[in-house]
Amino acid sequence: MKSLQKGFTLIELMIVVAIIGILAAFAIPAYNDYIARSQAAEGVSLADGLKVRIAENLQDGECKGPDANTASGVVGNEDKGKYGLAKIDGEYDASKTEAGDPNGCKVEITYGQGTAGDKISKLITGKKLVLDQLVNGSFIAGDGTDLADKFIPNAVKAKK
C-alpha cells in the first residue's frame, strides 16, 4: 500500500523562494525611488509657503526680507520642514514682465536639514533643489539644482 505524500518538496520551496527573490530585486529599488520622490515633493510645499513672504518682500523691491527676529515679530527667509530646509534667495529683477520669465527670486531647498533627522532617503540627503520664481508667481527648477531629475517633482520641472 502506498503512503500519500503531503506538503511541498524541497525543490518546490526553492523555486518559490527564487521567484520571491527576483520580484524583490525589482520592487525594492522602485520603492526606494518612490520614497525619495515623495520626500522631495515636500520641498515644493515649503516653497509654496514662502510665496507669501516673497510677495511681501517684493513690495520693498527685494526677494529676501530682514532676517528672522522673533522679538520684533519679523518673519524670516527660511522654513524648515520634515525632510528639508527652504531658504529665500536671489535678487529681484523688475525689468522682467512676461509671465513665464524668472523674476530673480529663488527658493533653495536643502534635503536632510529638516526635523526627520536620518529618516530621510539616502538618495536625496544633502541634495539641493533650486526653484526660480516666475513673474506669474509659479516656480520652475533652476540652475544650481543637484537633485537627480527623476526626483524633481513634476510641478516644477522645466518644459523641454
UniProtKB/Swiss-Prot annotation:
GO cellular component: membrane; pilus
Transmembrane annotation, as ranges: 8-28
Subcellular location: Fimbrium; Membrane
Residue numbers covered by the propeptide annotation in the UniProt entry: 1-7
Alphabetical list of PROSITE patterns matching this protein: PROKAR_NTER_METHYL
Membrane topology type: Single-pass membrane protein
Keyword Transmembrane helix recorded: yes
Taxonomic superkingdom: Bacteria
One GO term (biological process): cell adhesion
Family: Belongs to the N-Me-Phe pilin family.
Entry function: Major component of the type IV fimbriae that plays an essential role in twitching motility, natural transformation, and protease secretion.
Subunit relationships: The pili are polar flexible filaments of about 5.4 nanometers diameter and 2.5 micrometers average length; they consist of only a single polypeptide chain arranged in a helical configuration of five subunits per turn in the assembled pilus.
Protein's name in the database: Type IV major fimbrial protein FimA
Organism: Dichelobacter nodosus
Protein's gene: fimA
